[in-house]
Amino acid sequence: MVMGLGLFLLVFMLGLGLTPPTLAQDNSRYRDFLTKHYDATPQGRNDRYCESMMRRRGLTSPCKDINTFIHGNSRHIKAICGDENGNPYGENLRISKSPFQVTTCNLRGGSSRPPCRYRATAGFRNIVVACENDLPVHLDQSIFRP
């Protein structure tokens, strides 16, 4: 009996290691994406905005070289991962069909140690994301399309 139970537990534990990521893990990666790249209603979109947002989002220890914040509706961002607002782009990426209002924060100076100083560039861009289970999990780039 003990031998059978031990074998069952061994097989069960091995099975856990081979299962695909759970929905909770996928949602965690999506939440990380939102934390790094989403700000629905920005208060200003200047250098001070970048310095404040980068600090509040935990992207300044060390100073991140570049980060883009996407503004607007999160449903439209999620829709890039489907046909509603996205098209295939390269290998395993999707590009938005419509442009988004974005603010890109570029690190000024060469040091990656705080205090971090950023230069803001605001505009409308199509965005390229990697998706997992129909959720954006990585912002690859933003593209200006005239």
Curated annotation (Swiss-Prot):
Task: List the InterPro entries hit by this protein, alphabetically.
Answer: RNaseA, RNaseA-like_dom_sf, RNaseA_AS, RNaseA_domain
Q: Which residues form the active site?
A: H37 (proton acceptor), H138 (proton donor)
Entry EC no(s): 3.1.27.-
Location(s) in or outside the cell: Secreted; Nucleus; Nucleus, Nucleolus; Cytoplasm, Stress granule
Q: Which residues carry this modification: Pyrrolidone carboxylic acid?
A: Q25
Broadest EC class?
Answer: hydrolase
At which positions is tRNA bound? R45, C105, I127
Q: Which GO terms describe its biological process?
A: actin filament polymerization; angiogenesis; antibacterial humoral response; antimicrobial humoral immune response mediated by antimicrobial peptide; defense response to Gram-positive bacterium; hematopoietic stem cell proliferation; innate immune response; negative regulation of apoptotic process
| Alphabetized UniProt keyword annotations | Angiogenesis, Cytoplasm, Developmental protein, Differentiation, Disulfide bond, DNA-binding, Endonuclease, Hydrolase, Nuclease, Nucleus, Protein synthesis inhibitor, Pyrrolidone carboxylic acid, Secreted, Signal, Stress response
Q: How is its activity regulated?
A: Has weak tRNA ribonuclease activity by itself due to partial autoinhibition by its C-terminus, which folds into a short alpha-helix that partially occludes the substrate-binding site. In absence of stress, the ribonuclease activity is inhibited by RNH1 in the cytoplasm. In response to stress, dissociates from RNH1 in the cytoplasm and associates with cytoplasmic ribosomes with vacant A-sites: ribosomes directly activate the tRNA ribonuclease activity of ANG by refolding the C-terminal alpha-helix. In response to stress, the angiogenic activity of ANG is inhibited by RNH1 in the nucleus.
Which cysteines pair up through disulfides? They are C50-C105, C63-C116, C81-C131
The Gene Ontology terms for molecular function here are:
actin binding; copper ion binding; DNA binding; endonuclease activity; heparin binding; protein homodimerization activity; RNA nuclease activity; signaling receptor binding
| An example Gene Ontology CC term for this record | cytoplasm
Q: Where is this motif: Nucleolar localization signal?
A: 55-59
Q: Which residues form the signal peptide?
A: 1-24
The answer on whether this UniProt entry bears the keyword Signal reads yes
| UniProt cross-references to PANTHER family, sorted A to Z | ANGIOGENIN (PTHR11437:SF60), RIBONUCLEASE (PTHR11437)
Relate the assembly described in the record: Homodimer. Interacts with RNH1; inhibiting ANG ribonuclease activity. Interacts with PCNA.
Q: Member of which family?
A: Belongs to the pancreatic ribonuclease family.
Q: What does this protein do?
A: Secreted ribonuclease that can either promote or restrict cell proliferation of target cells, depending on the context. Endocytosed in target cells via its receptor PLXNB2 and translocates to the cytoplasm or nucleus. Under stress conditions, localizes to the cytoplasm and promotes the assembly of stress granules (SGs): specifically cleaves a subset of tRNAs within anticodon loops to produce tRNA-derived stress-induced fragments (tiRNAs), resulting in translation repression and inhibition of cell proliferation. tiRNas also prevent formation of apoptosome, thereby promoting cell survival.
User: What protein name applies here?
Assistant: Angiogenin
Q: Which gene carries the instructions for this protein?
A: ANG
